[in-house]
Amino acid sequence: MEPHLLGLLLGLLLSGTRVLAGYPIWWSLALGQQYTSLASQPLLCGSIPGLVPKQLRFCRNYIEIMPSVAEGVKLGIQECQHQFRGRRWNCTTIDDSLAIFGPVLDKATRESAFVHAIASAGVAFAVTRSCAEGTSTICGCDSHHKGPPGEGWKWGGCSEDADFGVLVSREFADARENRPDARSAMNKHNNEAGRTTILDHMHLKCKCHGLSGSCEVKTCWWAQPDFRAIGDFLKDKYDSASEMVVEKHRESRGWVETLRAKYALFKPPTERDLVYYENSPNFCEPNPETGSFGTRDRTCNVTSHGIDGCDLLCCGRGHNTRTEKRKEKCHCVFHWCCYVSCQECIRIYDVHTCK
């Protein structure tokens, strides 16, 4: 590991006590192999770090679906890393830390908004899919078909019950967001935006039945989209996220913080928009306080004028170029019937990395 990254990682781990208060550390269950066996070992619920009492009760009462919750968080993290692969902050996780993103999400930034939304959506998505696959006895297919069949088709197959997946995500992910402060309000809003995206993207999927491929009978069912579509949509919402300001009100239970759109001339955010109220660091240099790993040694696109281009990704520091040899299949030929034969070629590529 490079010295500057080693120093940053040590700084993040040593500051762990402060970091843990920033966001749900139960997300770390996505990185633990032992949690895939939760369904057969209920006592593991007590070993999940960061669970509030309501989440612990949920885990023990609905132990069958907890592996899907873990899978959903993992799915959200993987999608975050895909969506931000060419950005200065690329959704880096720290495997041996309970705060898997480091201090980055301590602040109420756009990045925090996106991660909460995609993780919440991931839980809803994975639970819904697991129910449709029949891996749990407490859920299954959606028997409420949401309307009569259309002309030329009838209901069939297993409609995915996204309402149940959303309910699980809401009950579990929002359980800790019960404080009367601005950060809880922001987290709950963005969690719900992620879940709403799942519901909005449900679509009819159909299959034809008949002799010789004819479509004498067509059956349809409700299905979730590929999770990449959810990530793409929420990434667009990240780019257009609404900046908010914090307002304090005195109520019977004491002071309560709420969020209001910062710019009155703009359209206020809807339940489908992401919200934030603190500016992001520039992520150019390593910084243990902000959790930035910097962009040194990151691969950049020399032909791009976007954020993944060497000018922006490298923050004006310039870039290095090296050549790389790669073995690839080439000159492939299809043979009847039925296989493909290929030769192996050595190709030379230029690789550009930030200084």
Swiss-Prot record:
Entry-linked InterPro entries: Wnt (IPR005817), Wnt3 (IPR009141), Wnt_C (IPR043158), Wnt_CS (IPR018161)
GO cellular component, one term: endoplasmic reticulum lumen
Lipidation positions, renumbered (O-palmitoleoyl serine): S212
Keywords for this protein: Developmental protein, Disulfide bond, Extracellular matrix, Glycoprotein, Lipoprotein, Proto-oncogene, Secreted, Signal, Wnt signaling pathway
Oligomer and partners: Forms a soluble 1:1 complex with AFM; this prevents oligomerization and is required for prolonged biological activity. The complex with AFM may represent the physiological form in body fluids. Interacts with PORCN. Interacts with WLS.
Family from the record: Belongs to the Wnt family.
Function: Ligand for members of the frizzled family of seven transmembrane receptors. Functions in the canonical Wnt signaling pathway that results in activation of transcription factors of the TCF/LEF family. Required for normal gastrulation, formation of the primitive streak, and for the formation of the mesoderm during early embryogenesis. Required for normal formation of the apical ectodermal ridge and for normal embryonic limb development.
Protein name, as recorded: Proto-oncogene Wnt-3
Taxonomic lineage: Eukaryota, Metazoa, Chordata, Craniata, Vertebrata
Gene: Wnt3
